[in-house]
Amino acid sequence: MRILLFAAAALSAVAAETALDRYIAKPDPAFTWKPVGAIPCQKCTATVLDMTSQTWRKPEEISRTTWQHWVTVIRPEKTVSDIALLFISGGANNGRPPQRADDMLAGIARECQVPVIELRMVPNQPVRFPGDTRDRTEDSIIAYTWD
């Protein structure tokens, strides 16, 4: 049994590189982040970051090429691990940072005693495609890109 587990682990370690692996590993000069400040959070420390994650498409293909996000890092008073839970959420790019930590996520951080990170504004929206007559959000963005 141990030999089988070792063989499976070895094979997974040498799995072929995919297009997604190459995309994620490719440096993007747009990537940056900076702390914005602390926000209220019961029995936790919550910090908001302003993060630019990537450049997506070219300016002639879409109205917003640079993806900007609000990231909230919630750290409970007592932690048992530095490994964090990551929650990816939606929202629109309206320019205002979060004013307080999400109560549910703060509760998870306290109960699990681990940091919790919320990455907002995925996908970045609204966006407009050339020749389109309206701004698109969420599934409408996905549907448009399938054409």
Model-derived features: where do they sit?
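Short beta-strand element of the alpha/beta-hydrolase
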Residues: W70, S81-G91
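N-terminal cap/lid segment of alpha/beta-hydrolase-fold proteins
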Residues: I24-T79, A106, L119, T145
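Short, glycine/acidic-rich beta->alpha junctions
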Residues: T65-T66, P97-A101
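Boundary at the C-terminal end of the N-terminal hydrophobic targeting segment
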Residues: A13-E17
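Sec-dependent signal peptide recognition
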Residues: M1-A7
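Cap/lid segment of the alpha/beta-hydrolase catalytic domain
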Residues: I88-P97, A106-D147
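Short amphipathic alpha-helical segments and helix-helix/interface helices
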Residues: L20-D21, D102-A106
